[in-house]
């Protein structure tokens, strides 16, 4: 897809299927298969709507790579661009376009994930220990900062398991 988000209006594979050497052309409408490691939410090929730039909408099997490339160039796709969600904070706003409108219906790894249907929150975990307000009131210093990781990060900071104790002499 050349769009960050769009409705798929039409896919015409007629010319690609007619090309000599093409064995099969498949679109998302013909392949109702979802995949996902923790939340089974991604179609192998987009169905009805694309949710990110470059999302595949068709696949070609052919006698050679050259024929497959020619066939993909013959596939006609008509899109209706939709407003994309471009920032994670924007995605959390009320009324933001839903990346996954059927979030509550997906199969997911229940021991670890708690999706919030009707939002863009695929997992919400609430951890509370002790009285935070009391802890802040008793603290000599309270430092507030916002920390972020890149959107694709295989080693997140895991702040929910970090404990730090500051000792005299600037030691942690």
Task: Kindly label every feature range from the protein language model.
Residues 1-172:
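Structural alpha/beta core scaffold segments of enzyme domains
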């Amino acid at each position: 897809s050349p769009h960050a988000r769009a409705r798929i209006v039409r896919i015409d594979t007629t010319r690609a299927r007619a090309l000599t050497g093409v064995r099969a052309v498949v679109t998302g409408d013909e392949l109702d298969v979802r995949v996902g490691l923790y939340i089974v939410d991604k179609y192998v090929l987009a169905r009805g709507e694309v949710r990110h730039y470059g999302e595949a909408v068709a696949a070609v099997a052919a006698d050679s790579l050259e024929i497959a490339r020619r066939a993909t160039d013959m596939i006609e796709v008509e899109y209706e661009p939709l407003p994309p969600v471009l920032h994670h904070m924007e995605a959390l706003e009320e009324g933001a376009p839903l990346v996954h409108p059927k979030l509550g219906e997906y199969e997911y790894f229940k021991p670890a994930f708690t999706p919030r249907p009707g939002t863009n929150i695929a997992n919400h975990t609430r951890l509370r220990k002790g009285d935070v307000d009391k802890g802040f009131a008793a603290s000599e210093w309270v430092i507030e900062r916002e920390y972020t990781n890149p959107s694709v990060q295989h080693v997140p900071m895991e702040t929910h398991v970090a404990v730090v104790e500051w000792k005299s002499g600037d030691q942690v």
